[in-house]
Amino acid sequence: MKNIRNFSIIAHIDHGKSTLSDRFIQVCNGLSEREMKEQVLDSMDIERERGITIKAQSVTLDYTARDGQTYQLNFIDTPGHVDFSYEVSRSLAACEGALLVVDAAQGVEAQTVANCYTAIEQNLEVIPILNKIDLPSAEPDRVAQEIEEIIGIDATGATTCSAKTGIGVEDVLETIVAKVPAPEGDVNAKLQALIIDSWFDNYLGVVSLVRVKNGTIKKGEKFKVMSTGVAYQVDRLGVFTPKMKDLDHLKAGEVGFIVAGIKDIHGAPVGDTLTHAHNPTDKPVPGFKKVQPQVYAGMFTISSDDYPDFREALEKLSLNDASLFFEPEVSQALGFGFRCGFLGMLHMEIIQERLEREYNLDLITSAPTVVYKAIKKDGEIIEVDNPSKLPEPGAIAEIQEPIVRANILVPKDYVGSVITICIEKRGVQVDLNYVGNQVSITYDLPMIEVVSDFFDTLKSVTKGYGSLDYELIRYEPANMVRLDVLINGDKVDALASIVHKDQAKYKGRELVERLKELIPRQMFEVAIQAAIGGTIVARSTVKALRKNVLAKCYGGDVSRKKKLLEKQKEGKKRMKNIGSVEIPQEAFLSVLKK
């Protein structure tokens, strides 16, 4: 046990943690040269394309240190994006140490700071590493100072390396061996194993990645899941080197996988504790918190025949993703679908992209919304995650919206423009500190403003240097209203949204104008309106197409022409009463995408 080291890497997107993990695998000969490829641990195509890590992965490597001893390094890769911080907190619960990898050219980013505090809260040994020192623009001394000022850990003797060229990677491994504490735990105690992650394999069923805290688990033994109390038998267990390598047992301090033929997707919930069926422990492993979805959106298949496949795809994805929530929903405009809950916009985009890619589904997503609380006049509180659930304006005493505390780190040249966008988004300034070249700005902002497009706007006004981290802190009363879209007097439920009253007119006008361009002309006039309750705030009309009914009259009497025009007018009127407007899918997509 004293030669085991469990650690994870905390780093911002693009600061080189996946490349560094590739180097670890190479130095320790985890894979042959032929099997090495870039970003070995980012196994999904979408992770490679976007260059981000979404799922936490784990690798067990044997490293022979300079003192001649062989150490077992269990390394858990973690994502760096703000939406996936729950993956990070889970990975950290399984470790004793964390490498804080910072790009020596760019410096500290807000996301890294947030994850670093999570690690410090869980009493992990945080070791600063300065990466990308091969870059001409690298300034290791300045960045070391920044780490000290912003995060507050001593970085004077920080190990420097370049994961790309391989310089200093062995020094990093030596630092891990020297500074990360060995795991505590008793091999002979009752079994306690934390499920860090679980995913569905078509052949094996549910595969769970576990960290054994106490005791030993052997092949063929029966164990039970503490939250459900259901018992299973171990079919296979072992470690990832990154390939699956079978072993006979896993003991306290180790990280590995367990396959027990669990078919039910929720059979082994992530963050749960496993223990022996015949001799169970009383208490589960602490340090795990349930994640609440922050953003909700309706997802619908374009053809209704795909609905059963869609349900199955969501069930499979939700196994790999503890934070994805979904329930069936019916929309008059879009048919059958699901109301899904996500951690943030990136999470939503990725889920949608995975559904479309891995399961060949064509999907439409309704406008994302956050959870509001509507307090009715009779005192009842309704949680509203869908505009259609909002009661009529007359029945509501007040609506409360979720407020997040956003920590933004930007280079000092961009402070003015960042403050401007925060004010536009109805933000309230809490704090502003200058730290070296960076400025740390803290704002309380309505969550709906942050999840819609705040991140993109922040990136564009700061030329990509700004970074953001946010957490929900409270609910507060706000003047929110439901904006409905009516087409020829009929409400289109998929286009309804909850907006702030001050912005309602502007948003309504914008929506109506956009729809006007997208809805094709019909044989009759189409009225597009935006309404709040019974008040119409914006209107636009798609003019009717008309056939030239006078083409066959050569000369002749004017009353003949009048008669034909009157007849056409009557026909259009009748058509308008009974005709229904086909809204093309592109119109929905374009309006919902903004």
Swiss-Prot record:
Name the UniProt record assigns to this protein: Elongation factor 4
Role description: Required for accurate and efficient protein synthesis under certain stress conditions. May act as a fidelity factor of the translation reaction, by catalyzing a one-codon backward translocation of tRNAs on improperly translocated ribosomes. Back-translocation proceeds from a post-translocation (POST) complex to a pre-translocation (PRE) complex, thus giving elongation factor G a second chance to translocate the tRNAs correctly. Binds to ribosomes in a GTP-dependent manner.
CDD domains: EF4_II, EF4_III, LepA, lepA_C
Pfam family, one: GTP_EFTU
Protein keywords: Cell inner membrane, Cell membrane, GTP-binding, Hydrolase, Membrane, Nucleotide-binding, Protein biosynthesis
Binding positions for GTP per the UniProt entry: 14-19, 131-134
E.C. designation(s): 3.6.5.n1
GO biological process, alphabetically ordered: positive regulation of translation
Entry keyword annotation includes Plastid: no
Domain tr-type G: 2-184
GO cellular component: plasma membrane
Family, similarity comment: Belongs to the TRAFAC class translation factor GTPase superfamily. Classic translation factor GTPase family. LepA subfamily.
InterPro entries with a match to the protein in the record: EF-4, EFG_III/V, EFG_V-like, EFTu-like_2, G_TR_CS, LepA_C_sf, LepA_CTD, LepA_IV
Membrane topology: Peripheral membrane protein
Organism: Francisella tularensis subsp. novicida (strain U112)
Record's subcellular location: Cell inner membrane
PANTHER family on file: TRANSLATION FACTOR GUF1 HOMOLOG, CHLOROPLASTIC (PTHR43512:SF4), TRANSLATION FACTOR GUF1-RELATED (PTHR43512)
Catalysis performed (reactions): GTP + H2O = GDP + phosphate + H(+)
GO molecular function, one term: translation elongation factor activity
Gene name of the encoded protein: lepA
Keyword Cell inner membrane part of the UniProt annotation: yes
HAMAP family to which the protein is assigned, alphabetical: LepA (MF_00071)
